[in-house]
A protein has these predicted regions:
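AMP-forming adenylation/ATP pyrophosphatase catalytic core
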Residues: 9, 13-24, 29-30, 53, ...
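ATP-dependent adenylation/nucleotidyltransferase module used to activate substrates
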Residues: 1-143, 173, 380
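Bulky hydrophobic/aromatic packing residues
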Residues: 40-44, 68, 86-91, 112, ...
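Short, low-complexity, polar/charged sequence segments that are solvent-exposed and flexible
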Residues: 73-76, 103-105, 141-143, 183-185, ...
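Secondary-structure junction/capping motif
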Residues: 2, 95-97, 201, 401-411
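Acidic, metal-coordinating catalytic cores used for nucleic-acid/nucleotide bond scission
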Residues: 61-66, 193-196, 285, 307
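Flexible helical/loop "lid" subdomain adjacent to adenine-nucleotide binding pockets
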Residues: 119, 124-275
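Short, surface-exposed, polar/charged, turn-prone segments marking secondary-structure boundaries
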Residues: 80-84, 110-114, 148-152, 191-192, ...
């Protein structure tokens, strides 16, 4: 079984940073796939002297789930790996349970990983899971291909966090044979055989020799030169370049750009993005919305900004950031304050209260983007004036304390596949230092 471990180690060595001091998180259900993964990851952790931490999520969906957590913890301890127990609490949905459980699991794992300082979570998906996804997709389920390396699917909890799947080319039966040779037992969740759900049905079909068409995800790397991030957290895409791109690539880039500019948790529906693409024929200017983003297209550029009208539908809600805390506002800006409690809200309705310096900064921002910019207000003064969070918009964004970090750039780079290994996380520089599309009218009135 050395070949299996070698295959997993090859992925770990290629994707992870051997010199990093950050811990490595591994999602550990106690099942056979995650146990095989932890066995392989333990070898890498020993080789690189990095700390490995197992994360176990108790979904609370089966009566013995607490006992399963105990067993998982005991197995991890036997392998010398500390385990953190996480629980999905609260009411559970009456429909769409697998999807809700998956979202809760990723959210809990992302939050725990961030608190540990981990930047990568190892996931035990196998080739069988990939083949099951193909069957599920063929049956109409909205599932995509599993990738060896991908950003966390939850936002903003998963910002800066990546998933690595070292077992994706390996078969489940081979991994279980390896575990048996090692004298290790694993948990079998009866839900995996519950034919009321799509995945167990796909698993049964796969065992009977049925195969689905492979799921092909668009490769966005050829489009890397088409997009830029504006200094206020929007996105600009080269219109003509997008027109020349393959349709599936163009649609996916539109979906991602809209999510990053709007701060939305998920992607707009492909049909809506294809509708936007249909309007790109020729060079006629237009304005349209997609997934919470306002898209303005002129001859040269498509610009994506937060749709300010979302305020009327409950978006852009204010938040309070306590001293020493970091929070995300509107899915777009990470706010950190060291000394004073802050209220963070949208600029809309507060522009008249800005000081001269902040107003000068605001006038360098596209008029349509201004209402959705973040402003601070300290809570220790009853009549504190609002302060623009983005304190400078020259060649790049300059920050003061409290700090405000736009998340659009890193998120888009991750989703577009530009971050391919741990050492690259947070290092992709795509800020538009010289980009000043014609829609920016410096000195325009508010």
């Amino acid at each position: 079984m050395d070949g299996l471990q070698s295959a997993a180690l090859e992925v770990l060595e290629r994707r992870l940073d051997a010199r990093s001091s950050a811990p490595i998180a591994v999602a550990f259900s106690g099942g056979g796939d995650s146990l095989a993964l932890m066995l392989a990851a333990r070898g890498f952790a020993r080789q690189t002297r990095r700390k490995l931490v197992a994360l176990h999520v108790d979904h609370g969906l089966q009566p013995p789930s607490a006992a399963w957590a105990d067993q998982a913890e005991a197995t991890a301890a036997r392998l010398g790996v500390p385990l953190v127990r996480l629980a999905w609490t609260g009411p559970k949905p009456s429909s769409g349970l697998p999807a809700a459980a998956r979202e809760a699991r990723h959210r809990l794992i992302a939050e725990a990983s961030r608190s540990l300082g981990a930047r990568v979570v190892l996931i035990g998906h196998t080739l069988d899971d990939q083949l099951e996804n193909a069957l599920m997709r063929g049956a109409g389920a909205p599932v995509g291909a599993l990738r060896e390396w991908a950003p966390s699917p939850v936002w903003p909890q998963g910002r800066g966090l990546f998933l690595c799947r070292p077992l994706l080319a390996l078969r489940r039966a081979d991994l279980r044979a390896w575990l048996a040779d090692e004298g290790l037992g694993w948990l079998d969740d009866p839900a995996n055989a519950d034919l009321r759900y799509a995945r167990p049905r796909a698993r049964l079909a796969l065992a009977e020799g049925v195969h689905g068409a492979p799921i092909l995800e668009p490769d966005l790397s050829p489009l890397a030169d088409l997009w830029r991030v504006t200094p206020w957290g929007g996105v600009a895409i080269d219109r003509r370049g997008l027109q020349r791109a393959a349709p599936d690539q163009a649609v996916r880039l539109l979906q991602i750009a809209a999510a990053c500019a709007s701060g939305a948790q998920g992607l707009a529906r492909p049909g809506r993005a294809r509708g936007v693409m249909a309007r790109l024929t020729g060079d006629k200017a237009f304005v349209v919305t997609l997934g919470g983003a306002r898209i303005a297209a002129d001859v040269d550029w498509m610009t994506f900004e937060r749709e300010a009208g979302e305020m009327e539908r409950g978006g852009l809600a204010p938040i309070t950031v306590e001293a020493g805390q970091t929070r995300v506002w509107d899915g777009r800006f990470e706010i950190t304050t060291a000394a004073a409690d802050l209220r963070v809200e949208a600029l809309r309705g507060h522009a008249a209260g800005l000081g001269d310096a902040d107003r000068a900064v605001m006038l360098g921002v596209a008029v349509s983007a201004r209402p959705a910019l973040p402003v601070f207000r300290t809570l220790d003064h009853e009549r504190a004036a609002p302060r623009l969070a983005l304190r400078g918009l020259r060649a790049h964004i300059e920050f003061e304390s409290p700090s405000c970090r736009p998340l659009c750039e890193d998120r888009l780079a991750a989703a577009a596949g530009m971050t391919t290994r741990e050492a690259e996380i947070g290092t992709i520089a795509r800020m538009a230092k010289s980009l000043r599309p014609p829609y920016v009218k410096a000195g325009s009135k508010d």
